[in-house]
Swiss-Prot record:
Entry annotated with the keyword Aminoacyl-tRNA synthetase: yes
Keywords: Aminoacyl-tRNA synthetase, ATP-binding, Cytoplasm, Ligase, Nucleotide-binding, Protein biosynthesis
Family the UniProt entry places it in: Belongs to the class-I aminoacyl-tRNA synthetase family.
Motif window: 'HIGH' region: 57-67
Residues that coordinate or bind ATP: K631
Name the record gives this protein: Leucine--tRNA ligase
GO molecular function terms noted in the UniProt entry: aminoacyl-tRNA deacylase activity; ATP binding; leucine-tRNA ligase activity
EC number in record: 6.1.1.4
Record-linked Pfam families: Anticodon_1, tRNA-synt_1, tRNA-synt_1_2, tRNA-synt_1g
GO CC entries: cytosol
Localization, UniProt: Cytoplasm
Name of the gene encoding the protein in the UniProt record: leuS
Amino acid sequence: MIYSENTDEKSNQHTNNLYKPCEIENKWQEIWDKENLYKTDDKSSKKEKFYALSMFPYPSGNLHMGHVRNYVITDLIARFQRFQGKSLLHPMGWDAFGLPAENAAIERGINPNDWTKKNIAHMKSQLKLLGLSVDWDKEFATCDENYYLWTQFLFLELHKSGLVYQKESEVNWDPIDNTVLANEQVDSEGKSWRSGAKVEKKLLTQWFLKITNYTEELLQDLEKLSEWPERVKIMQENWIGKSKGANIIFKINEFENEKIKVFTTRPDTLFGVTYIAISINNPLINKISDNEILSKLENLKIYLKKNQDKDQKKIGIPTNLKAINPINSNEIPIWIASYVLDEYGTGAVMGVPAHDQRDFEFAKINFIDIKQVIIKDKDNDKSTFKLKNAFTDNGFLINSNNFNGLCNNDAKKQILEQGKINGWAEEEIHYRLRDWLISRQRYWGCPIPIIKCNNCGSIPVNKKNLPVKLPKEIEISSNKINSLGSYKDWVKTTCPKCGNLASRETDTMDTFMCSSWYFLRYPSSKCKTKPFEKDNVNKWLPVDQYVGGVEHAILHLLYARFLTKALRDNNLFDIDEPFKKLLTQGMVQAAAYKNTKTGKYISPKDIKDFNNPTDPNDDSKLEVLFEKMSKSKYNGIDPESVIKKYGADTARMFILFKAPPEKDLEWGDSDVEGQYRFLCRIWKLFLDYRNNESWDNQKNYNREKENSLTKSINIAIKEISNDIKNNQFNTAISELMKFYNSLSSSMIYVNKDLRKDAFKKFCILLAPFAPHIAEEIWNLIGYQKSVHLERWPIFNEDALKEDCYELVIQINGKVRDKINVGIDISEDQIKQKTLTRPNVRKWIDQKTIRKIIIVKGKIMNIVV
């Protein structure tokens, strides 16, 4: 980009020393847009590529500080890589389908499409205020017909390869949002990830994707992700939940040919099994004829359905069935237990109360025997004793026949081997991961491209008939938008196979389906014939730097990895993993004032004394907490108001300086003002530099100052470069401040060329952090091209070498003086300089010098 005439020095006379960020920023944002400065260089094959991407936002309507942090971090990294001469792809789009938009539209009585598009326009204008180096030509929203056409296309590709199926299943039902949730969308307390509702169970026919076909690859390939946070990889590993163990076969005493298979990771505790627990839907229940037991079971099912949020781990029903322990032929009771899940293992577990806390509590409440078979110390603890809790540590076997005395890990192997030989045990691997349920019973989502025919069953829509569009004219009631099944004209269609009357699938896809491939679309965002160009994906992917919240670790990130592998296997591209390097930024927090008596939060507007905050309603002392910004806590900060007051560059500098990116950031007005003052000082220094010709007086030149500034320049280049590469943006700004201090204290003492070179390099180093002020100063210095088209300076290692060192002077082994000497000084010159120094003379006068020992670079010892 060449500056046009209206940006040169003549038309930008700054008549005072005031830094006016809004004027500067508005001007340069307009110029950058007009000149298309950040357009992706799609055609360059010689340059190394860099794909920088933030997790795209849901268009809620307003930018918040969490957004700002995410996009500023990504922008800094993108700008830094552009300075390295790389070809940059830095796009932005919108995760636009989903329940929040539908619910907001219901509240306002408007079409969610209109609501979403309005929000996108507003948020885009807010994002542009930040001066992001985004290529807006790549922009799309997942609700665009020319995007969800390709979501449907990819669904059909997965269907063709056998990764899509439909089955009746007990599903997680959100009673507030009236839709199904995937397992990953239910939190540890059994609540919806979005609405917070207690999740219920329903039996529905649903569509699934076979993510379990890729379980082992998803797990093993975590090792390839060396530049991902370890905690994210651990979260995915735990969610996949690989368990190595064994299936143990227990015979049923009452039925000669009936057996029950139980999965366990602890064969070493087999001698301690005192009951078998089965789920409420286990097939073995069909063998029970006792009406009293069956009646209790029905009551338990009703209770569980009504009390899903309650702790039911101790609820059990004894049956009249007995199992035979294969290791010792002991007879053990079979219980129906609420804590046993149908979908885990075989829907049955072996109860070992002495060595599993859940089993221990169940046994205690139901008066079941507890038999200890592992002790901590085999030398001092020869017998069992009354346990207060289950013993779950490693140890040595007791009460286990010929396995007594073995450490439990060795016993696992030997017991399993015996079971394999005798036919009652087999090695087994289990996974916690379940197939991805993608059906949703709402309007605002991507329609599933399936036609249901009474003759032919479920038939995929012909690809040439995509997209299956959402009905435009919709019915909005007081509390819902009617689901797709309500639009009869839309539902009616013909079967593509037999031509008979048929109906469309009325479920929409989980919005995570749309967001699990969007990064593949950006390199070919305008392509009209396919979702993406294979060559473009192979060129630009994987994403070199992905930035987003850790809350997406087992939802978006896992789904995106799965979909990438599945589409690779459909020969759509050749990459294995979508994201090379992942940065999960911390939350932005601000002070919230809470009345601990009432639990209510008080608005800062109602607080008179912030040194001693009290509730104006009852004078209670308020607790000051730093919490995630929220409207309900009155601690939200509007980014637009901050930008209008201080400028985008100040907001960027604060966000990057206040805390390391992976840590939570605490908002502080004084810290924002501190960054603003720093930019003001930079601005004033530039004006002083530009307006003071007297600085070029050779009488002021100081060789030592010039050497010091040269060294500072190179230290800054080296340290800031390393800090950005290591995501240490706060320390990079600290180095920038040190460079500023050196520059400002040296200006009048150094020659013109060095001064200009220092300012040039300072501008480039500043540019990724504060791009507007750097561009303005660069332009006013007189450079014709944008600073953002420059190359990053390279530090000179030689300039960092010391030209002198501190020599410690000892007399008879005691330190008496210190002196700075040049690194090339001779020993004779050292003696001349030191022996005449007053602090040395007073210790050697009238004494005989026996010898002088000089260790160059360190010490001089005079022996007298």
